Amino acid sequence: MASGVCPPAELGFGAEYYSVVNGVCSRAGSYFGGRPVLTQAVGYAVVLGFGAFFALFTSFLVWLEKRYVGSQHTSEWFNTAGRSVKTGLIASVIVSQWTWAATILQSSNVAWQYGVSGPFWYASGATIQVLLFGVMAIEIKRKAPNAHTVCEIVRARWGTPAHLVFLTFCLLTNVIVTAMLLLGGSAVVNALTGVNVYAASFLIPLGVVVYTLAGGLKATFLASYIHSVVVHAVLVVFVFLVYTSSSKLGSPRVVYDRLMAVASAARDCSADLSRNGQACGPVAGNFKGSYLTMLSSGGLVFGIINIVGNFGTVFVDNGYWMSAIAARPSSTHKGYLLGGLVWFAVPFSLATSLGLGALALDLPLTAAEAAKGLVPPATATALMGKSGSVLLLTMLFMAVTSAGSAELVAVSSLCTYDIYRTYLNPGASGKQILRVSRAVVLGFGCFMGVLAVVLNVAGVSLGWMYLAMGVIVGSAVIPIALLLLWSKANAVGAMGGAVSGCALGVAVWLTVAKVQYGRVNLDTTGRNAPMLAGNLVSILVGGAVHAACSLLRPQHYDWGTSREMITTVESVHAALDDELKEERLVHAKRWIVRWGLVFTAVIVVAWPALSLPARRYSLGYFTLWAAVAIAWGTVGSVVIILLPVAESWTTITKVCAGMFTNDAVYDRLDDVNLRLRAIMGAMPEAEKRYRQLHETEMHPAGTHPANDDDDDNNNNQMMHS
């Protein structure tokens, strides 16, 4: 192409990414060029600085609550947060726990690959599990109110063999999720700053281990809220930057026009203008090759894999069960529904902005760079410079550490209650359990780093692990769901379904890779066809085997033993007993079933169905689409930031008053006095004994008031005589 037409005339933008070489207009070979955007100093500052800050700050918040509110840091408190967490904080925890590195990176990658359908299918395919899990959260309150883990319920209902099978699946899920978090976190820190990937693997968990050791699940929840605030603040910045304020984009019209131009059939995509898998021209598998359509075969296949795979990451991850256990009974269903709806905005709004923004800017990203998750940092850097990269790196660090802390406590709880208390020391005291819980947190924190290094050496990527997880643990989803939902569920069927589903899923996955691509390796097993087949076989076989066995030999269960066998080590909050009444929980179940199914139908069926007639979007339709992304992201961010503060305002004011006055001390003394009066009123002997001790301490031997009275009477008589 002649030097006078560079960049190509059909674009008219992105000139900084084109140059004339030997008289020919050529596009840059990549965006990053293999060089980190930021210095190593910035990387270490984020990983170590933020890690230390949140470790100290979260531990300080936990201490404040203990000092001025009077929280008792028992083993029950460490592992269940007192079972009294309110709606806003539970929703914040769900959002934070479900926001992985993949949520931020992979969602924008599929936007870069498939256009508007990518962010939608990523968000909807991973939201419905949280909405539907709200039903399980209520059922655990109804049928096993004292449970610490889902595996305790398995043992109470199906016995020791089933307990060991599902304990293995739950621990495997936690290990895989942790591996994904550290693989994604270390890879991005390395790509953006040049920090050694192995060093990042060990340094990222460091701060998480410190505050989790100090405060257990409550510290994890507090940290999750703080991390959610940062993630959503950055989210809003990027969304408004792309669609309202950026000088390079700044409006839906500009983004729309440029998306039409970059996918135009008239665009020249010859060798010098499109290399290394760069986005150029019509999109294969999309309607008219456009990025502006939901009619995308690639997007649909990704959506199916995403939906199937993510059921395993929710239903078999003990972290979600712990969040349900920690919630107040009156807050459980609302927290999960709100958390799911707010989380939808993270991948949808962010990828609709940064993912489509990368295309609209015509960034010379290669397929390899996109696979590493570098689409969002590329767009952020192009629009804001290095400050954009710092913002995105901070956002990613928050996502990885927050979800990682939840996995730490989940593993700690499984090892403590399902191994130590069940098989090693059934009579363990609260102090012993607390000691073991903290030891497991420390041990698993170290194991996290070693595991990430091993997987990095083996060449396993975040994307491969993300897609493969459903194949490995998806078979346990339906048996675990039926554990609480079906009174006839059979123990043998549950074990057989979970094990056979996993085995057949892996076999089909590897077979399809071998048949279709001629070899089995990380590359072929990570492609769409083998992953789709393996995920579907795993979850469907697991469910079918369990259902068939349960229908042939039903194992009726009335939930009596689950209440008798699963006990707390220390007493729990008696004030919550009223919320555990059956009629209130049944009402909550009906509420979450109704609204969970409604929103699932809207997100998975109605929304895409209504988008299909639009085919290739018009400017007006795309403007509406962008407006929904902006509004959902903004409203969700406001709710998730302000609601926990509003619900905890009484506690916040009490802590603040305690820090600057003695009011909190007097309030606690009054409370203790009131409790003692209630006890003494119910026990007359205690009242009598108290008065005797009080008189003895106030009047030592020989100075009893009665003796003084006698002396006064004698003196008076002598005077009268």
From Swiss-Prot:
GO MF terms held by the record: symporter activity; urea transmembrane transporter activity
Swiss-Prot/TrEMBL induction comment: By nitrogen deficiency in roots.
Membrane protein topology class: Multi-pass membrane protein
Null allele phenotype: No visible phenotype under normal growth conditions, but when grown with urea as the sole source of nitrogen, plants show reduced growth and slight yellowing of shoots.
Any one biological process term the GO annotation gives: urea transmembrane transport
InterPro entries for this protein: DUR, Na/Glc_symporter_sf, Na/solute_symporter
Sequence intervals crossing the membrane: 44-64, 85-105, 120-140, 164-184, 197-217, 221-241, 296-316, 341-361, 393-413, 440-460, 466-486, 492-512, 532-552, 592-612, 625-645
Entry keywords, A to Z: Cell membrane, Membrane, Symport, Transmembrane, Transmembrane helix, Transport
Domain of life of the organism encoding this protein: Eukaryota
GO cellular component, one term: plasma membrane
Known function: High-affinity urea-proton symporter involved in the active transport of urea across the plasma membrane into root cells. May play an important role in urea uptake by plant cells at low external urea concentrations.
Family: Belongs to the sodium:solute symporter (SSF) (TC 2.A.21) family.
Identification of the protein by name: Urea-proton symporter DUR3
Organism field: Oryza sativa subsp. japonica
